[in-house]
From Swiss-Prot:
Biological process (GO), any one: microtubule-based movement
InterPro entries for this protein: Kinesin-like_fam (IPR027640), Kinesin_motor_CS (IPR019821), Kinesin_motor_dom (IPR001752), Kinesin_motor_dom_sf (IPR036961), P-loop_NTPase (IPR027417)
SUPFAM superfamilies named among the record's database cross-references: P-loop containing nucleoside triphosphate hydrolases (SSF52540)
Ranges where the record places region Disordered: 401-485, 732-788
Ligand binding (ATP): 83-90
Record-stated family: Belongs to the TRAFAC class myosin-kinesin ATPase superfamily. Kinesin family. Kinesin subfamily.
Protein keywords: ATP-binding, Coiled coil, Cytoplasm, Cytoskeleton, Microtubule, Motor protein, Nucleotide-binding, Transport
Coiled-coil segments: 513-948
Segments forming domain Kinesin motor: 6-330
Protein name: Kinesin-related protein 5
GO cellular component: cell leading edge; cortical actin cytoskeleton; cytoplasm; microtubule
Organism: Dictyostelium discoideum (Social amoeba)
Amino acid sequence: MATSCNIRVMCRFRPLNEREKALKENQTCVTFPDETQVIVSGQPFTFDRVFTPESTQKEVFESVKDTIHDVLLGYNGTLLAYGQTGSGKTFTMGSAAAESDFENVEQLGIIPRGNHLIFNTIAEESDGNAEFTIKCSYLEIYMENIQDLLNPKNNKQLKIRESKSQGIYVEGLTEEYVASEEDIMELIQVGESSRSVAKTNMNQRSSRSHSILIIAIEQKSSDGSKKRGKLNLVDLAGSEKVSKTGAEGIVLEQAKKINQSLSLLGNCIHALTDSKREHIPFRDSKLTRLLQDSLGGNTKTTLLVTASPHFNNVDETISTLKFGARAKSIKNNVKVNQEKSAAELQIIVNALTKELSILKVYSISLENLVNYFKSSSYQPGNPIPKELEPNKQNLLLLQQQSNSSSGGGGSGSSGGSSNGSLMMKPRSTTPTPPSINRPHSSASTHRHSIAITGTHSKEGSGGGLTSSISSSSISSMSSLSSSIDNDYNGSSLDDSNGSNGLFNPLAIVEMSIEMEKMKEDTQLLIEKFKDEISEITIQYQSTQEELNQCRQQLDQIKEQLEQQRSQFIKEQSLLKESERNATLDSTSKDLKIQSLISKIEDLRLLASQVIQYLERKRLSDDFDIGIFMGSQDGANGDSANMFSLISNSIDQGTYEDDVNIEDIIRYLSEEEVLTMQVKLQLQNKVHQLEQKIQQLVSDLNTTEINYNQSILQCQKFESENSLIKRKFKSMFSSSNNNNNNNNSPPSSPSSKLLIQSSNNNNNFDSNLNSSSLSSSLPSSNGIEQDQQVDHQVDHQVENDHLVNDEDNKLLDENSKLKENELKLLLEIKNLKLQSEKSNDETLKWKDELSIKSALYQNQILNLQNENQSLSNKLNVEKQQKQSSQSQQIEFATKLNDLIKSSEDDKELYRNEKNQMELEIASLKASLDEMDLKNKELQDQLISTQRLIGARRVVKIVRGGADSMKTALATKEVFGQFTLRKTENSKTLFQ
């Protein structure tokens, strides 16, 4: 018998993490009055158990382990973890436990502790008379696709199926037999290596999919009975806010799918708690479909909601607790999944055969009565012969005759009376009228009917027929014979007491005709009502879908508008700031350029003075030394030539390639060398300043280009805003057309404003470009530059006024758009009212139809006959025999197919092994090649290091001609040595 039980809901709050402790507002918003209550921001919530942040893993498991014990007793169980991302779901479940975590026993979660409990209870409670088989499977729901974590190569789409024996299951999912808790943890680690995980701001290792670990336990006793229990360990992905997690790209798409599936799960729970709701949307997502048995089905479910106690996550915590409070009122109808043994089935079969024999005898007696009424010897008003009365003696005689006959139910005869009474005729072979359903028990006739349903089980070595019969039906079978005897003894008729008018054949014929007419009329009415109900439901569903689509579109448009408004405001502020920064940069750069120009002029004057000083000194030196150096005219000519070369090179600012600097320095004195160094430093500074000026000019150009690009981006955003406004207007016009209103909204002047703003921006850009070009060139008159700057500032002020006017116009347009949104909301409310009216009408129709159908069903039930019910029973028995035979044949064929598939799988595994061996051999060969290449590279590195170590630094020694010759000789030797080494290195690398 099925029993109802509520879903158990428990709540756990995790401790504050390091990020929350680092915040200034490191305060909690949660208080715990007792073990079953929690208060969050003044809102109280009550659950079966509440765990504080100081609670341990052991305490949580002790409150949850009853579900695992129920699975060992033959029930289905589910442990479900739900909560915000980073709230501790995976830690509580223990699905991501690594090998190092097993050393710290206190940190183990529900899954490893549950595995330990399962195998310990089997070892302690089993007395050797029972056999246990445990199978494990592991799956994840990623982006609304079911993936087999134990066999990731299983790329085919796994489908969800439903059957009476297995309930809801995944077709083609890998199941592994396990013999210890270590086997299960190894499978979990294999599955976790294939799971989808990503890093977010809220969690360093955030699960991007829902995972379900399924442990199926089958217990077979010595008498042949079986118990099956299934434990579902569900670790849901956390609900996320993109603003907090910072998800982008693929992670953002994953977050959308996760939030969508969790919202659909919430819709199912809301529908289950609503008493007026008839349809539960389990098929809207894969997650809700797999959890259908856990939510209102044949499963004992425990929901564990996890939350954060920090004030920053108070909204997510309250929504999570509301989810758990709503799920707490769901009731599940659970029963033990048990198959009866052969002895129990034999008792049931014996009781049924006994009932059948009694019913067959009773049907023979009734058929004999009917044949008597149809015969010519029957006259209305005459008493019924005693041999045909359905009393106990006649029934015993008929039973003996049926047992002695070979056909097992052939013709039966009764002994005649002294005055030659009528002989009993055999059972008529005339066709019986169609069967009409009848209630199982009636107060007037004390007769019972028992239904037997047989199904073949695929699991196990041999499939037998399993019958499910309630205890009430077995008790009714045991009391059947006594009730029938009492009926027969009480139904004897007296010849003297009113035998007139007991059976009127004309009335029976008329009643049968009326019954057939009533059947036809009621069937026609029922078909009409069914058609009308189907049409109404289709219309209702279509209107609901249209309304939902309209709501979704409106919500999306609102979100897009709000995002674009915020982006537009941010971009405007950024543009203004960039304009201000650009003006400040331009002014600062102009000042820098002017200062650099003044420095360059000063340096030029200094350089000219140095050159004049050098020329004067050269002339004075020539005049003083000319007399003393009369004999050395050639040398003086050389020195004069050298000084002329130096002066020419200094005047030109560049040195020729043919001049040797060392020769020049050798003939100079110390003062001349110092003057030369000063002049060279000055020239280097001048060159550096010129380079800086060029860099500043290029920076100005780049800033102007960036400013132009920012203006173009602003224009693009404004054009996108206008397009969005047009789309919104088109949506508004389409909604008005659907409501048969042909009034079109007035056109907004946004396009004109955009054109004016783009023209103004272009003018402003041209002014800026001209101003920047004029400011980049050095001006002769400072007064004209100041006037130009004032003129540019005036233009900028005018442009700012224009931009402000355009902003005001855009704000006016936004107010108009808000008015249009309010109108749309009013229309949506009207549509909702219309849909509610249609719903009320459909409910009224349904109530009327249910009343009418109930009346017609009562009439039909009152018009049923006992003969038809008996014939229905016989037909059901025949069909059951045929179905059992067909099921045995199907089971044999399925066994053959399984054997063939297992052989095919073995061949596939062999082929895969061979392929893996070939791949390993190829990898080994590639490793050998890589080792050879590494050795060659190491040799090349050694040779290059030797070359680098062999190089010598050549120092140029200042002095006489001999030292210069030795320096040149060492240069030539070093060059030849390096050339040889480079040629050798090239040959090595080739």
